[in-house]
Amino acid sequence: MKNIKRIAVWSGPRNLSTALMRSFGSRNDFDILDEPFYASYLKKTGIQHPMFDEIIKSQSSDYKEVSEYCKNGYFKKSYQYQKHMTHHMINNDYLDFALSLKNVFLVREPVLVLRSYKKKNKNYDFQDLGFRQQFDIYKYLKDRFGLIPIV
């Protein structure tokens, strides 16, 4: 199996993560994995996001299966960019896959995140912004594995 170098970028919504992902995607040596835990999150929470049915049908909704794919899934190119939304991780049960990846935390000024999020979502909960989950995932990787992710 090809030795693929994998980058996991952990973000919350409205952090310009899609723009960064597209930038990496424009390179000819990168494959992209966009929000692989989205279906798992939707199925576990029952939240009716736009295109709920299509997402559930197009992705695995099993956290264990998705984490294994993030760690060992085959891709054609030498590098893989994984865009992860921190609020899609319900708990830290399936984060061990991140040990084998280079982890990066994308953080944007919270006031700008909130301002941008409020424009698109009138009803929201603080948990929807992913700040707490991002901190928890960072701390988990640091405390459990001794990793010092890039911020």
Segments and roles (model prediction):
Residues 85-151:
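PAPS-dependent sulfotransferase catalytic domain
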Residues 1-75:
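PAPS-dependent sulfotransferase catalytic core
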Residues 3, 75-77, 99-100, 109:
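Residue-level preference for short coil/turn positions at secondary-structure junctions
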Residues 48, 59, 80-82, 127, ...:
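Residue-identity detector for glutamine
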Residues 68-93:
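Glycine-rich phosphate-binding loop used to anchor ATP phosphates in small-molecule kinases
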